[in-house]
Amino acid sequence: MKRFVLMVGLVLSLAFLLTLPSGALAPQAKVPASLKAGVTQRLGADTDITIAYSRPGVKGRKIWGDLVPFGLAPGNKYSKDKPFPWRAGANENTTIEFNKDLLIEGNKLPAGKYGIHMIPSEKDWTIIFSKNNSAWGSFAYNQEEDALRIIVTPIKAPQQEWLMYGFEDLAGTSATAYLHWEQLKVPFKIKLAQ
């Protein structure tokens, strides 16, 4: 009788395990500290602009001039001791992609996918659109791969815990793209190239 009860218990336990979803017993993937995000805006009839990035949090830290230094970041072992710009997000390269030529702050940028890097300062910021869109961060940044550099002025903004990109001032064939993090917004104007 004990053997019978033991066998029934074993069969029921096995049946229960077989009914669990396949991932229930597998180790769970670790959630990254900076989640991936993206935003897309259409201009005109058929021009899509997509910014893909990862979203670090403020988490009580001083961001500008500290976590994100003003000027180029000092070199480290990943950059082979070469100073580098900020990756304009976290983890992988922040990218912008569009299917038609655009004017960025009045400067023509051909259709394509570009890595975005930034050089912050206390006054004006340099935004770099790099032909290298697949680097991990900015450690391997090479100025010779720049497609365009623009200078913009950041503005004070309400507190934003998680870094985000967005579009505002939509006018059919133009918009202002922006990075917003902590209490700062970094806008840059985009317009269809006619």
Describe the function of each predicted region.
Residues 1-4:
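Positively charged n-region of N-terminal signal peptides that target proteins for export
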Residues 6-9, 114:
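Conserved short hydrophobic patches within well-ordered secondary structure
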Residues 23-110, 115-194:
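Targeting-peptide/extracellular-domain and disordered-appendage signature
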